[in-house]
C-alpha cells in the first residue's frame, strides 16, 4: 500500500501498517523508471493500493498511475479516515525507520 498523504498527516495520525509513504506531489517522479527519483517499490505489474485521507487524492493518483502504464492499481475508497473509523490497525509513524530520512552520509 502507498500512503500519499503529506508527511504531517502521517506523523499526526499514523498510517496503515506496512504502508510506504510517497507524498502525492512526488508520485509521478517516484513511480517513473525514467525519473532520477524512481523508487523500486513501484512496479507496473505489481498490485498497488493507494490511499489518502478520504479518497479524493488517491482516485486521481490511480488515474495518473494507469496513464503511466500501471496495470493493477486501485485506491482505498474511504481513505485512511475510513480505515481508522472501521477500527483497523494503525501504525505510529514515529515507531518505524522507513518514515525517517537518513542523513546523506549515513550508510
Predicted stretch roles:
Residues 4-48, 56-107:
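Rhodanese-like catalytic fold shared by cysteine-dependent sulfurtransferases
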Amino acid at each position: 500500500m502507498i500512503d500519499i498523504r503529506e508527511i504531517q498527516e502521517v506523523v499526526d495520525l499514523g498510517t496503515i501498517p506496512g504502508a510506504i509513504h510517497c507524498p502525492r506531489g512526488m508520485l509521478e517522479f517516484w513511480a517513473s523508471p525514467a525519473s532520477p527519483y524512481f523508487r523500486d517499490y513501484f512496479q507496473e505489474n505489481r498490485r498497488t493500493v493507494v490511499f489518502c485521507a478520504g479518497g479524493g487524492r488517491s482516485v486521481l493518483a490511480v488515474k495518473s498511475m494507469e496513464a503511466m502504464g500501471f496495470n493493477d492499481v486501485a485506491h482505498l475508497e474511504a481513505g485512511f479516515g475510513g480505515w481508522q473509523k472501521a477500527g483497523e490497525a494503525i501504525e505510529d509513524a514515529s515507531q518505524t525507520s522507513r518514515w525517517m530520512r537518513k542523513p546523506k552520509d549515513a550508510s
